[in-house]
């Protein structure tokens, strides 16, 4: 028989940098999960990924206080900022431009994010990523 699920916790945790400090500690502590055990398992699972990369993580907590977790690909904005070389998007998207990004770069990002996107093909995924780039105040150019 499968374990009874008590709940899900969604967090964005930096790869290889899980610590029992907020926001991880309080979120897991409320559910009675062993915080240090999660930190050890998460850091071991993400040691191959560049340290500090934000990873959306879904933690499934069971009735016996055990847990499992699934990490997803980093947010599209993380990839976009890295590709363009900026720290943040435009404060006023649509008015002030934060830079430019090539459509080929968007396609690469879409390829990396494909499994987490609600898209059937690479063209649809590229359009989703393009929307994120435009929302950050970037101008999309051909190339």
Curated annotation (Swiss-Prot):
The keyword Ribonucleoprotein applies. One of its GO terms (cellular component) is cytosolic large ribosomal subunit. Keywords: Methylation, Ribonucleoprotein, Ribosomal protein, RNA-binding, rRNA-binding. Pfam families: Ribosomal_L11, Ribosomal_L11_N. GO terms for biological process: translation. Coiled coil: none annotated. One or more lysine residues are methylated. GO terms for molecular function: large ribosomal subunit rRNA binding; structural constituent of ribosome. Belongs to the universal ribosomal protein uL11 family. NCBIfam families: L11_bact. Part of the ribosomal stalk of the 50S ribosomal subunit. Interacts with L10 and the large rRNA to form the base of the stalk. L10 forms an elongated spine to which L12 dimers bind in a sequential fashion forming a multimeric L10(L12)X complex. Forms part of the ribosomal stalk which helps the ribosome interact with GTP-bound translation factors. This is Large ribosomal subunit protein uL11. The gene is rplK.
